[in-house]
A protein has these predicted regions:
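Domain-level signature for proteins that mediate thiol-based redox and metal-cofactor handling
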Residues: 1-132
């Protein structure tokens, strides 16, 4: 296993429940059983807080850790664009990730393609929460 993935997954500062959330969703990976609950607080079309709880593998934990820390103070439209890029990443022959989101290059690469569903679970949960 990649030590970089473990290091990213160990950042759990947003592993919390937001009591006064404005958006919330739970999503489960039917293939492996990973489960992700996302709670978001959105004000003036901007994500101002992001909390998650998960019972999942380290790849899913690394993905949600990066997504949560990168999403705070970003406009919902920007997150929507990121979701589109990431969801098409593996299908589009590993398309380049926009500069604004280059931090995701740490986990989205061809060596992790076998863990695609684990990496995408947090993105699907956010999409569900925001009804995108």
């Amino acid at each position: 296993m990649d030590l970089k993935i473990l290091q990213i997954a160990s950042n759990t500062e947003n592993n919390k429940v937001i009591k006064d959330h404005t958006h919330k969703a739970t999503h489960k990976n039917a293939i492996c059983g990973d489960k992700m609950e996302i709670s978001l607080k959105v004000k003036e079309n901007k994500i101002v807080d992001f909390g998650y709880q998960c019972k999942s593998c380290v790849y899913c934990q690394a993905s949600v850790s990066l997504l949560s820390s990168s999403s705070i103070n970003k406009p919902v439209e920007s997150i929507k664009n990121l979701l589109n890029v990431i969801e098409n990443f593996f299908e589009d022959n590993l398309t380049n990730i926009p500069k604004e989101w280059k931090i995701f290059k740490k986990i989205f690469d061809k060596k992790n393609i076998a863990r695609k569903d684990c990496l995408l679970l947090p993105f699907k949960a956010v999409s569900k929460a925001l009804k995108l």
